[in-house]
Amino acid sequence: MDDDRPVWAKRITAEREARKWNKPQFIEALRAHSDTPLPGKASLLRRVHSWESGESRPDDFYRPLIAKTFGTVTAAIWPVAGSRESDAELVAGAGMDTLEILTRLRSSSVDAAVIEGLRITVNRLCSEYPHMPAEQLLLEGRAWLRRITTMLDRHLSLAHHRELLSLAGWLAALVGCVEYDATNRPAAEATRQAALSLGEDSGDTEIIGWAQEMRAWFSITRGDYRGVLAAAEAGHAAAPHSRAAVQLYAQMAKAWARIGDRRQVEVALDQGRALLEQLPYPDNLDHHFAVDPAKWDFYSMDCYRILGHGQDAASTENKLAESYAQNVIQTGTDAAGVERSPMRNAEARVTLGVIAVREGELEKAVEFGERALQGQRQSLPSLAMVSRELGTAITEHYGSDSSASEYLHHLRQLQSSAR
């Protein structure tokens, strides 16, 4: 097929082939997932050929059906152009720059313009999560958190007081995530609990949901899979239709994969996919708490990598993990080669390394593993967790092969840093 096909056309082919479906089998899968009758076999075969060749783009009916059949969301295959917020929005949105906001914070007056300026500042900081060095983001996040919490002691209207509590809750959640990335576990847990309390005090159920998602994340990196499920239950009870709930389903799926329950993995992935498909596309793709639909590939990749353990290298699980990893890197890298999602890309490279080991390609596996460790912006507990899987796979298949010794040494250094 033409290599110049659209990305979505290549993806349809890759998803179908990873499942070892021929085109008639793909058609039957579409029928099984459709709520309405589909045209005859000959008509659908022509459609599938035109989709995979890139000659025609599936319409509004078939795009979500194809995504559902492949266990993902429409926007993961056909991305919507989303905004990337810049610092200029601080001025454009609130009519004030940072200096003016700080000056007015020191005064006794807190009006709607100040609240809006703070909201945009918090959104900007949340949008810096994938790129800004952890130390700098912690410094700024904590500074703004102190400023906002200090304001809570002033005489405020009930609405302004509630809004400030909510903004403080979002900042606390962000700071807690960065603290955990840097392996400051006690501080991260304390900040997570502060975010939970601020969410409860402000009545912001989304913050409550994210505080529980953080609990699930912390738990899975410690190997506490039952803790993940408990956090997901609490988060879904508090914010059942939120973006946090989507990510909690993903954490559940990852936990079930590690427990070894394939059926529950599929159930959790499908529940999360269905909820994410219903939610509006994020206004800002960089926002840490937005849940970019493309991230669903990232979670599916993790699950199928785990499910592929002990299976043939050409198994559906391993082929899906490989395909998802390639999609994660492609989506997380812009046209100039700059990585928009460096932490996701690192875990995707680890996945490709694990698949390479299963295919008997040690040199390729080590190359992917080393590349994953080179990122400037890292979530050390998560990276250590998945890299450990690659290290274990290399050791199981190749023992103490000298060509892998340097990578395994680097991996031990990472594990030491992540403790």
What does each model-identified segment do?
Residues 55-76:
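DNA major-groove recognition helix of helix-turn-helix/homeodomain DNA-binding modules
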Residues 1-4, 106-115, 119-419:
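Conserved binding/catalytic microenvironments
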Residues 31-58:
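Recognition helix of helix-turn-helix/homeodomain-like DNA-binding domains
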